[in-house]
Structures are given as structure tokens and as C-alpha cells.
Amino acid sequence: MAVSTQQLAEELQIFGLDYEDSLLEKLAELCVLYRQTEDGMVSELIAFCTSAGKTCLTVDILNSFEYEVLNKKLSKAWHSASKDSGHAGTRDIVSIQELIEAEEEEETLLSSYTTPSKGPLKRVSSTPETPLTKRSVAARSPRQLLSPSSFSPSATPSQKYTSRTNRGEVVTTFGSAQGLSWSGRGGSGSVSLKVVGDPEPLTGSYKAMFQQLMGVREVLTSKIEELGSELKEHHKIEAFTPLLVPAQEPVILLGQIGCDSNGKLNSKSVILEGDQEHSYGAQIPVDLSELKEYSLFPGQVVIMEGFNTTGRRLTATKLYEGVPLPFYQPTEEEGASEQTMVVVACGPYTTSDSITYDPLLDLIAIINRDQPDVCILFGPFLDAKHEQVENCKLTSPFEDVFKQCLRTVIEGTRSSGSHLVFVPSLRDVHHEPVYPQPPFTFSELSREDKKRVQFVSEPCSLSINGVMFGLTSTDLLFHIGAEEIFSSSGTSDRFSRVLKHILTQRSYYPLYPPHEDMAIDYENFYTYAQLPVTPDVFIVPSELRYFVKDIFGCVCVNPGRLTKGQVGGTFGRLYLRRQPKAMDGGGRQGLSVAAQVVRI
């Protein structure tokens, strides 16, 4: 169907609507995509602008017009065609995909009967309302593949989400973000992605649910001894004293913070559990009344100095500071790229009152517009806590819904060329709910997509062009913050305290006992959930308020979640600049990071 940009311009001039010349091509594409004539498209556009009180056509207005008018009109036509053809008004996601594949097979069969001089034959639609036309559009449009009827007969778009007025608002900024275009090079730039492990990263499933208490005890003891050895060397401590040995002079003890009961830790219930080498795993109560400042949580490995005159109670007078790991040193090839744009977003990708994936589709549109070099997507993609999932109201198996969601993201961003990194979550209802969590598996990737799509474990350390990213979808801020106790003479930021704990404890999840939502396999935890280095950028999504902070030279980002209940949430974007010849005070290659958290 040929569309004339000149005729579109004439129609717009008739109604006196101002516009940018660059928008005519976009308007022509919409005419082809939604099978509209020039005058019909302009008439609907004028009606939309008039009702919205707009006198000038902009990119944002055109995007809103496509979303609020054209897509809804197309969805209604799809339902009407489904009813007229004698089928149920809703199709699940499997049946839609089968129809698309069947159509492609028929077109392939028709083309096999043509001569090379002729073009491939296409089936002709008798009217624009036939289901075939809608399937053709659905094959190209991510919004149609993830239409409300794909998952649940009762699915309707969230009214609060669609009526939001603050989309695109920048809510927090870090670094020199002023003047940046916030657009990447997509597939045109060279991107090096490498998963880093100590000794190796988690790449597949493992046998869980079989660990003995002695095995857990050995892991925790090893953590105490290894971290204690590092702190001993750093603080130049001669020797540790056993916990239960009485002494009249000050003693220095190594151990792990615990609680003397099953309740929440408080200043009166703190105990110190010693290591095997010095204290044989003994425990001793701790009196914190002499400490002016402290921040403690269960599972924290600490070195304390104080008095233990009876061998039954330690009166702590000093708490030694923890020390983070050194930074990652990239190779010459990894550090060759000078600038990289990264987008990070965390699920859920649906609002709590609807199973429609409108927020995810809006994110796909942003990826195609900005063309970031890398886009990191954290689960959950199909949230186990969603009401319709809990009540089993979906018409398709969880695995099928997830695969279609994944397929839509991959195909929908193909034109941008952006590299995609998928991080699972323990809230992904279809995936293995064990920590550390193995990567997703998806066998339907094409050869081209395999070059730009990567599935990683939870948690994961990922080098992007020599910049080390720490990635985790677990809400560390909430889990540790809920168990922490602290005392400070001045103002203190809880987020900064928790982040310092994570970096100095050198673990992606240092809390013990873990949160009730966590099913931890400690044998694999010891292998795959430790920080191999201090990351340059640490992504820590949380239900708590978004932020960007510099902790020990590590840029820590909480991008928030893409949805918050029934309303839209936030996502993050980072702009990284390498300065190969510059070195910072920590002996690492110069790195400049600008970051923003933006409303979807």
C-alpha cells in the first residue's frame, strides 16, 4: 500500500496543524502498519489533537496517538474478527503463534511454485477486517503478541497506568548527566560482554534440596576464617583470642554476628559466634553499651575489641572496619571502548491489577528509540506474587507465557541492535526458586540473536567493555535493612550502610539466617554468590526508593521497579566513559559514570 508524504502534508495544512518535517515519514509508516489512507489517518489525528488541546504535532503526541487510538482500534477489530470467524473471543498465546507459523508455511508453499523471475506469491486478504490481516500485523507488532487476550479472558489494561501524566520524568541524576543525548550506538558499536566468576560462573541447573547442616556450618565457618584472615592482615592484628578465654586486658575476637533467640536482632540480643580455628564455634553474648557507633546484622563477620574478664560476656569497645575487594582490571581489548550506554529495568513488567504487559511494551519502544548498547532486564517476568498468577486465572502454562514474553522482547528490539542481558528472579513463577539461581534457558534463538542475547545467573558479575557490573534481582536493601541494628552520633543513611556491608562482606547475600523468601543452597552459594571483585557499577533493584550512590568508588544504582502496584514505576540508564590513559586513586583505569532514574 503506497502512502504519499506530500498528501499527508497537504491534509495537515488544510487543518492548520503545525508539524515537524521528520514526522511525515513516521506518519506514513503508521498508515502502512495500520492500513489507513492519508485522509483517514489525518482525520483521526486531528480529532485526537483537538480533544487533547494540542496545536503542534510532536514525537510524544504521535506516540500517544498510536498507543491510545490506533492500537486500541486494532485490538477491537481483532476481537470482532475472532467472533465473526466462529472462534472464542480470546485466543491464548499458543494459538496466536500457531496461526502465525501456519500462515508462514502456506506462503512458503506458494512461493515454491513460482519461477525465479517472479516474486513470491502472497495470499490476498479479501477485506481489511479478515483475521489474516490481523495475524500479519501481530507477527510484526510486539503489542499485538502481548495483547490482553493472550493470557487471560478477564485481562483489561490498568486505568491508573494508562492515565499517568509523568512518563519520561527524570527523578534522580548522578554524575555529569547534563547535555547528554542519552542514546547509544545499538548494533553499530562493538560490545564485549564477559561473565566473571570466582572460580567460575554459574551456567546451568544443579541438584538442590539436598544439603546437610554440617555442610552449611562448614560454609559459614569458611566465610568467617577467610574474611577474618583478610581483615587481620589489613589491620595488622597479631592474633585473635578465643571467645571463652577470660582475660583482664583488652582482647581482639573474630566471629559472626547472631541473635540469642528466634526474634529480630536488637542491642540486647547480640551474640558473637566464633570460628573453628580459634574458638571452636563457641558463642558469647556482646554488650554494646560502650560502642558509640555501630551497624550490625545477623551473619556479619566482624572483628571486635573489648573486655572479656569472665569468659562469659564481651563488653565491646571497638569495631574494626571492613575492607572491600580491589576493583576489576580490564584487559586492553575490554577497555578499548571509550563510551557505553546501558539501560537497566527490573520487573514486575505488569501492574498488580492487570496481566497486560503495557509497561514492558513501553520499555521496548524506549529501547528502539534510544538504541542503548546494552539493556539489562531483571525478573520477575511473570511474577509469582501477581494476583492472577496466584489464583490460576491464566489460560496458558506459565512457561509458555514467559517464552512469548521473551520472544516479544527479543524480536521487538531486533531493529535497535542492542545487546540484551536477562537476569532471573526468585519471583519468576516458572523458574527454579533456588539461590544461586541458574540462567534462563531459551532454545528458540536465531543465529543473529545469539550474538546479542545473553542469559546470566542470579547473582552475576558481568564485564561490559571492561566495566564490571554486579547484578542481582534479590531485594538486598530490604532484607538486610529489616534486620540491621545501628547506633550513630550523627545522621546516617541506611541505604549507604547496607551497601557498605555488602561490599565489605564480599558477598551478594551476607545475611544469615536468610529472609523467609530465600531458599539458599549453601554449597553452591559459596561457589557462585561471592563477589570476585568490587564492581564498578552495582545494580541493586529494590521495593525501596530509587537512588544512585557512590560507595567506596562503586556506583550503586537502585533503578526501582518498572511497575509499583497499579501505577508505572522507574528504570535506570547509565552512560559510561573510559579514560584509558587516566588512573584513579585506587589504581584502576579512569572511569566516568553518569546515571539517571526515569519514570516509564
Swiss-Prot record:
PTM: Phosphorylated in a cell cycle-dependent manner, in G2/M phase.
Phosphoserine: residues bearing it: S126, S141, S147, S152, S154
Localization terms from the record: Nucleus
UniProt modified residues of type Phosphothreonine: T127, T130
Pfam families in the cross-refs: DNA_pol_E_B, DPOA2_OB, Pol_alpha_B_N
Keywords attached to this entry: DNA replication, Nucleus, Phosphoprotein
A GO cellular component annotation in the UniProt record: nucleus
Major site of localization recorded for this protein: nucleus
Region (Disordered): 107-165
GO molecular function list: DNA binding
InterPro entries associated with the record: DNA_pol_a/d/e_bsu, DNA_pol_alpha_B_N_sf, DNA_pol_alpha_bsu, DPOA2_OB, Pol_alpha_B_N
Extent of Low complexity compositional bias: 139-159
Record has Cell division as a keyword: no
GO biological process, one term: DNA replication, synthesis of primer
Entry annotated with the keyword RNA-binding: no
Biological role stated in the UniProt entry: Accessory subunit of the DNA polymerase alpha complex (also known as the alpha DNA polymerase-primase complex) which plays an essential role in the initiation of DNA synthesis. During the S phase of the cell cycle, the DNA polymerase alpha complex (composed of a catalytic subunit POLA1, an accessory subunit POLA2 and two primase subunits, the catalytic subunit PRIM1 and the regulatory subunit PRIM2) is recruited to DNA at the replicative forks via direct interactions with MCM10 and WDHD1.
Subunit structure comment from the entry: Component of the alpha DNA polymerase complex (also known as the alpha DNA polymerase-primase complex) consisting of four subunits: the catalytic subunit POLA1, the regulatory subunit POLA2, and the primase complex subunits PRIM1 and PRIM2 respectively. Within the complex, POLA1 directly interacts with PRIM2.
Membership in a protein family: Belongs to the DNA polymerase alpha subunit B family.
Protein name, entry field: DNA polymerase alpha subunit B
Organism of this sequence: Mus musculus (Mouse)
Organism placement in taxonomy: Eukaryota, Metazoa, Chordata, Craniata, Vertebrata
Gene: Pola2
